[in-house]
């Protein structure tokens, strides 16, 4: 499990009251994940508490942004957010727990790793991890809620960088191009070379590739 946290900062009551103008009594964090569908690599989650005193223009669902735009927003989010944490669940945890439960685990780690305790976690999707704070699921939240958009960007950029690192170790699969998703070239490499330690053996295409080399 990896976790990246913002430096701990003391929050005044005035600042806390402004985290979400529609919820003046709440400290709200947005939560999202990246990497549920790929055949390789960890699943990554992020939790973000935005600072309304330092607004960030251009936040959106990470999937609709270019890589260049995501990278630029990543730098702004880690600099201007009141608190953030990025966490992950490993390939072994995915294979042991299944991808859904591993995703919930990564989200839980991200929320619990925040340097400021939120009173509400808004989760992208239709279900929430078990948390020590109140949580609500918001379908398409990454396109609707700025803090969830910010979390989606941190999770996506972090995971893409992890897969570039994996490419350095296992160059035959092209992780730097497809980030572990089941593209035609990735599937062809799986059939030719078999899976590596970064592949999720609980996923059917990886199991099929294993069967070919047995």
UniProtKB/Swiss-Prot annotation:
SUPFAM superfamilies: Ribonuclease H-like. Residues 26-214 form the RNase H type-2 domain. A divalent metal cation binds at residues 32-33, 124. It is found in: Cytoplasm. It holds the Pfam family RNase_HII. Manganese or magnesium. Binds 1 divalent metal ion per monomer in the absence of substrate. May bind a second metal ion after substrate binding. One of its GO terms (cellular component) is ribonuclease H2 complex. Belongs to the RNase HII family. This is Ribonuclease HII. The lineage of its organism: Bacteria, Pseudomonadati, Pseudomonadota, Betaproteobacteria, Burkholderiales.
